[in-house]
């Protein structure tokens, strides 16, 4: 499966109950063939609203840390979450949602 097909499949996914409450599917962001990958658990409210990973307070802190070690999500790393849709109230995903 190529990258665009994977992204298209994620954007259309309705395999678990999270698709009923999401605003956006939060796919990864950054360089697709990056040597450095950061993976979070699931998107929060800010990420769900913007459709981008790690854009809330945690993301702002992560960007500062990345800058300190000469990394950034636009040029040399990739940032994603295991779960692509926000669990309601930012709770842990249910076992139904786990892969």
What are these regions (language model features)?
Residues 1-97:
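A polyanion-binding, active-site-adjacent surface
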């Amino acid at each position: 499966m190529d990258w665009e097909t994977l992204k298209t499949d994620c954007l259309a996914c309705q395999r678990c109950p999270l698709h009923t409450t999401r605003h956006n599917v939060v796919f990864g962001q950054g360089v697709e063939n990056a040597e450095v990958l950061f993976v979070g658990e699931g998107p929060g409210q800010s990420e769900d609203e913007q459709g981008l990973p790690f854009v809330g307070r945690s993301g702002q802190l992560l960007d500062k840390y990345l800058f300190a070690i000469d990394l950034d999500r636009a040029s040399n790393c990739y940032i994603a979450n295991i779960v692509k849709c926000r669990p309601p109230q930012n709770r842990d995903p249910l076992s139904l949602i786990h892969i």
